[in-house]
Amino acid sequence: MKGSVIIIGAGVSGLYAGTLLEKAGVDYVILEARKRTGGRVLSGQVLANTPDGVHVDMGATWFWPEIQPDFAHLVHQLGLTPLPQGRPGDMLYERQTTSPAQRYPAYVTSPESFRLQGGMQALTSALTRQIPAQKIKSDHQVVSISLLGEGMQVATQSETGEGSLFTGEHVFLALPPALAAKMTFEPALPERVLSHWRKTPTWMAPHAKYVALYQTDFLQAQHLCGDVSSRVGPMVEIHDVSEPDTGKTAIFGFIGVPAKSRWTVSEAELKRLCREQLVRLFGEDAAEPEAEWIKDWAADPFTTTEFDLQQDVGHAQPQQIPAQEEWADKLTGIASEWSPQFSGYLAGAIDAAAEGVGHWLRHVARP
């Protein structure tokens, strides 16, 4: 198959890059290892049997319009509805299991954070609709990238081992640098570049999220905003992510136990421990969720590498390809981690994709 441009990854950055190339009239293909689009944007509806009309984000969730105006502008352009994070009420602080959590007036964050009506999947779905279906190849894990004359050849492998080859003149890396470093490059990329990529933290990689959905809005009845900070766990940071006008409560928490420790118990046991914590915090109203989910990003091979489990979480910008060597003008990193301003954030995915595609169109693309 031929295409002027090959995008590796169908997360936010890859999909947005596709829409920009589509508008520019450039031939392209998007190769995605997973059997779905969205990358680190993931809804509970995709995970398992979410009740109709309810959307819960198991991955990237928030944006900050005041400091991320380009992302906010895209949300507006796509006709999506921002939801302010939080609601009126007190927050809780859990110090120990032997005494009730303490209530405090909730503080107002600045800048204010927002979610999207319909979850962040509303964003990826809107971007996907702007791309012809045949240009997105799911279940195509890239295993190697080779220089081929003046062009490039990309080899992929499906879950069943079926291989495919794609050729183009440029590759956009819309996946975490640590995952890009696991691919085979022929000729080899400079080791200093690969080493830097391997050590670049992947945002979300160490995290696990738990979400519980309830049939009643008990937070309002208890005059709570849903924000909790806990020194007990297993969840150390908890937020209300309910959608307006549903009459339901959706609560999510970051599980604070390190990945290799939480893997010593079953998912069912981890869910039980999370439910017990919610009962301690909110009472028997939280004992029996209508639905519950856990997404452990550390166990996702298309997100996390062993390096991610060995280092602190952070926002570190990886190196791009050296401009003077044989790979010059052949590869561009556009995943969120490559954003100089919002590395690791949703806005960073838009920022890096816009910068990378714009530079290629202005300075590299053949007329």
Annotate each PLM feature.
Residues 4, 13-16, 24, 45-47, ...:
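Conserved flavin/dinucleotide-binding core of flavoenzymes
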Residues 9-11:
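Glycine-rich Rossmann-fold phosphate-binding loop(s) that bind the pyrophosphate
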Residues 22-49:
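Glycine-rich FAD pyrophosphate-binding loop
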Residues 44-72:
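N-terminal glycine-rich dinucleotide-binding loop that anchors FAD/FMN and/or NAD(P) in oxidoreductases
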Residues 61-89:
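N-terminal FAD cofactor-binding segment of flavoenzymes
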Residues 62-68, 108-128, 137, 265-268:
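Short beta-strand to alpha-helix junction loop
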Residues 138-153:
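A conserved short coil-to-beta-strand element within the FAD-binding core of flavoproteins
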Residues 158-223, 285:
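Central helical "cap/lid" subdomain
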